[in-house]
């Protein structure tokens, strides 16, 4: 998808915030992935680069001296990336990331939606620590019929700074953008 985005955004890079991710856990792999992403995206700068789906068993490797975090820190110092984030699918991993590595990461991304609320307290803690929070799967992987209500729920949640609904067609892009433009608070009845 990076190659498609690179082609679509060519000449308009400054109008967008670019985020991407890598499964690399070691220094060499992450260094290589950053360079590949820059090339694929046809840019010299990525706004947010994320360690993707980081399980607890990989924390020591990723954040150790020879790990992916060092490569991202160097890329940030060189002006190749703006911010360093992590994504997680396990609540225990998210909690540890925020508590133990919160001074190193600038964003966390975790599944959060109207039916998956387990991350609420940890996302709130992340925000208290100044870590940006991103709602992954705000439409529960496409399983929610009332997408407008689902996106309004995220906007009213007070624990997510942004949500990234998956979109597979221009119509879905327009639909989700319309919710943002017409955003209204949830009523008491809707919250219940």
Task: Annotate the PLM regions.
Residues 12, 78, 157:
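Acidic-histidine catalytic/liganding microenvironments
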Residues 25-121, 127-134:
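Glycine/proline-rich, positively charged
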Residues 16-18, 84, 133, 163:
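Hydrophobic/aromatic residues located in beta-strands of well-ordered beta-sheets
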Residues 5-8, 94-97, 173-176:
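Hydrophobic packing residues within well-ordered alpha-helices of enzyme cores
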Residues 9, 101, 180:
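Active-site catalytic pocket residues across diverse enzymes, especially alpha/beta-hydrolases
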Residues 104, 120-192:
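Structured C-terminal cap/extension of enzyme domains
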Residues 1-16:
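N-terminal binding-site loop/beta-alpha segment at the start of enzyme catalytic domains
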